[in-house]
């Protein structure tokens, strides 16, 4: 398996290749293969990472840095790797990146806290990397803390939110150099509390889910410890507003199915939260280690993921039931989503500002390393052959020109 990390201390991309069962706290145990690339220092550290796959199947790594640039790297990184393309957004060095993800087959979208979104056509910039590029840009009301999209469920839709910026879903259309944006859903805050005080808004995570009716189903996590479920046919206020914890929620990711999500707070808890009503669920009894079936009619925290010392800052889930987390203790942990068992634990030695799970196939780290080394050597060989062919073509053209000159002089 392979994960890319953004190292805040050095500004590098760290590639971690590992097996399930690894634990770096065991001195004589197997160790992951950790390699650093593109270290530009803390002042230019990466705030967001994204994997981009073009319509032709070519993969790239996109990185949004603190200095306001977006860099595009080859997927198979080497110690000599440099960006294929660098885009500088005006004024972005004064404003943090709050999101970076693939928008469509060839486009990556990057968002700033001030509400600006940039759409970069990776297929274009990697071919014409030496030419000036002006990314199509549009703005929405800020400040934003996060944005989300789901290319399969709701293509062309992006949801945004932030501090005193309630959930809003926009429809986007990118044609050439122009971007058009239209608001399609604006959430309303919940009603005032029992002492008639306004409930504050501070969205920290957004997640689209499949809808069985026309409209959107959107989940949000907040810095006030709430998880909210919006169904647009239900109304502009959340269908559910559940207080999960007293601590701020920092993350939000899909669970095993549409009935649950995974989140973490600013203390040390990472948990599965189930919000499907009128169903039977199985909860573990920690006293006797036996499972018991319960009828549940309201959302609840199902199970917690153990082990983290301090806040989990970033997490990501995979389609094959894995959860990866990194936190203040500088450990990368891998969990089984269903059982909550920790299947790998690795000290990465840096504060992590972004996390990208790019390969969930359960091969051994050594097998993966051998495969990728062979791929890199093949790429280098083809590049060398291309260079030789270009040189021979130039010589052939030069020889033809010289021959023509001699014929004319004769």
UniProtKB/Swiss-Prot annotation:
CDD domains: Nsa1 (cd22858). SUPFAM superfamilies: WD40 repeat-like. Residues 374-383 have a biased composition (Acidic residues). It is found in: Nucleus, Nucleolus. GO terms for biological process: ribosomal large subunit biogenesis; rRNA processing. GO terms for cellular component: nucleolus; preribosome, large subunit precursor. Keywords: Nucleus, Ribosome biogenesis, rRNA processing. InterPro entries: WD40/YVTN_repeat-like_dom_sf, WD40_repeat_dom_sf, WDR74/Nsa1. Residues 366-385, 390-410 are annotated as: Disordered. Involved in the biogenesis of the 60S ribosomal subunit. Component of the pre-66S ribosomal particle. Belongs to the NSA1 family. This is Ribosome biogenesis protein NSA1.
């Amino acid at each position: 398996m392979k994960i890319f990390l953004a190292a805040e201390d050095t500004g590098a991309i760290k590639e971690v290749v590992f097996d399930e069962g690894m634990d770096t706290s065991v001195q004589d145990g197997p160790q992951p293969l950790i390699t650093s690339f593109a270290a530009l220092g803390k002042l230019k550290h990466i705030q967001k990472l994204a994997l981009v796959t073009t319509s032709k199947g070519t993969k790239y790594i996109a990185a949004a840095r603190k200095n306001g640039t977006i860099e595009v790297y080859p997927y198979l990184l080497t110690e000599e790797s440099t960006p294929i393309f660098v885009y500088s957004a005006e004024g972005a060095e004064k404003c943090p990146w709050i999101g970076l993800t693939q928008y469509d087959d060839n486009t990556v979208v990057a968002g700033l806290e001030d509400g600006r979104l940039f759409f970069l056509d990776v297929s274009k910039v990697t071919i014409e990397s030496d030419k000036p590029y002006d990314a199509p840009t549009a703005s929405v009301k800020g400040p934003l803390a996060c944005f989300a999209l789901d290319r399969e469920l709701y293509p062309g839709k992006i949801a945004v939110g932030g501090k005193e910026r309630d959930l809003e879903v926009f429809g986007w259309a990118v044609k050439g150099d122009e971007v058009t944006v239209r608001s399609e859903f604006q959430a309303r805050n919940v009603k005032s509390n029992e002492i008639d005080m306004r409930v504050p808004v501070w969205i920290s995570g957004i997640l689209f889910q499949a809808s069985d009716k026309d409209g959107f189903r959107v989940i949000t996590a907040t810095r006030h410890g709430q998880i909210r479920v919006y169904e647009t046919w239900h109304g502009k206020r959340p269908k559910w507003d559940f207080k999960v914890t007293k601590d701020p929620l920092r993350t939000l990711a899909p669970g095993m199915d549409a009935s649950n999500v995974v989140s973490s707070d600013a203390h040390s808890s990472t948990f599965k939260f189930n919000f499907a009503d009128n169903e039977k669920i199985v909860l573990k009894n920690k006293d006797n280690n036996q499972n018991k079936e319960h009828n549940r009619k309201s959302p609840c925290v199902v199970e917690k993921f153990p082990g983290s010392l301090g806040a989990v800052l970033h997490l990501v889930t995979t389609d094959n039931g894995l959860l990866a987390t990194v936190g203040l203790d500088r450990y990368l942990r891998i969990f089984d989503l269903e059982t909550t068992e920790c299947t790998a634990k690795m000290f990465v030695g840096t504060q992590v500002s972004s996390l990208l799970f790019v390969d969930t196939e359960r091969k051994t780290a050594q097998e993966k390393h051998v495969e990728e080394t062979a791929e890199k050597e093949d790429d280098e060989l083809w590049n060398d052959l291309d260079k030789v062919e270009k040189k021979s073509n130039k010589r052939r053209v030069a020889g033809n020109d010289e021959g023509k000159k001699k014929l004319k002089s004769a």
